[in-house]
């Protein structure tokens, strides 16, 4: 992977010193984008607030990197990747940093940059991987007005450059919020091949009938939102360290059969 990064930098250097001059001379504009010379794989986390996105990231990294809670804990995007030492940057630094490929995010506005964060952490599971945590979606399609920046446009921009998009739901909120409907029907159009739908926190379902009811509700809501003939596959998961189920209780879900 280090050789790939060096090759990427050489390509960008050649473009800047040679190809860009030719493009300027012949009045031809074709800048390199992140998708032209890809770096480490990117995973975008979307979902309703308190659906377990940040907790899942912490579990994956094996460290408490993101703050998590029942109430919305953040209103901006967070870029999380590997670093030899723990480090954080604000949004303005991220889009102007010469070694980071987020320069094109600068045009999303100062309000977006004020809430954008970059976190590097020495967790081996993050090596050669970038995770993008997003604010929890709310029951209003006009969330951009509440956040102060164009949330939907930011989602689209990150989704286009992401290699995988994980969309989280949980048993407490198996329905689709106003923002979720907007994201599915507008911002993720043409990108559905990247999306995996996750029903998280299934350990909160005390009985198998509770799980069936929750799963069915989510399927029904998604069928009215996603314009496809068949309901997309829904993956179920939970975080073992946070599990609340009691395996010896009658009719409880056999959590040992659920794979993360």
Segments predicted by a language model, with ranges:
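Conserved nucleotide-binding/hydrolysis micro-motifs of P-loop NTPases
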Residues: 85-87, 136-138, 172-174, 201-205, ...
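Conserved active-site aspartate in kinases
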Residues: 133
